[in-house]
Amino acid sequence: LKINSCKASILTKAINTPYDISGTFYDVGEGIAYIRIEGFDKSVKYRVEQLLREFADFEVDILEMAESKNFWQNVNDLDFLKEIEGDLWRVSVKPTDGSRIIEMLDPNIGFLDWCGGLVWLRVDEGLNVREKMQKVEGHAMCLLGGFDQFHPTSTLEKKLSNSIRNKFDPKMLFNQEILN
C-alpha cells in the first residue's frame, strides 16, 4: 500500500493493527508511507481491505505485484539515496524518535524504515549526526563520510565487546578491519 500525504506516525498506527504488516517505509520529503503485506492471496486481499478501511481518511494506492516488488527491492538496495549528495548515515532509535531525528537534522533526504526506528539520512558533508542527536537515545553509523563508521563506545562496552570477541574468535580471524 502507498499512503499519500501523511505523517510518519501512520507507520505506528499501521503496525499496531492486527493485519500482520511485513514492512514499512516512510519518505520524509514526500510525506508518503509504504506498507508491505505478504502471504497467501486470500489473506493478503483480506488484510488490504481492512487496512483500506483503517486508512479511509487518506489517499491510498495499491501497488501491483511487479511495482511493489520493484519498490521494496529499491528500498533494500538503498536506491533512494544513491544520487543524493552528502554523507550517508544509518541511525537506529526508538520508532517514536525517528521523526525527531529528521526534525533535528533537516537532512538533504531522509527515510524511515522499521516503523520509524531506522532512519536513513543524507546530510551535508561534515555534519556530525552523533553530536546533533545527543538528546535522543540511539546509535548512528556513518556509512559514507568523514566520520568513524561505528558509534563510539564506553570503556566498559569496549571491554565487554573484546571479551566476547576473544571467546568466539580467539585468533582474530574474522572482521579484523571492522573490529579493530
Each predicted region: which residue ranges?
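C-terminal substrate-binding/cap subdomain adjacent to the FAD-binding core in PCMH-type
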Residues: 1-85
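Conserved glycine-rich FAD pyrophosphate-binding loop
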Residues: 58-180
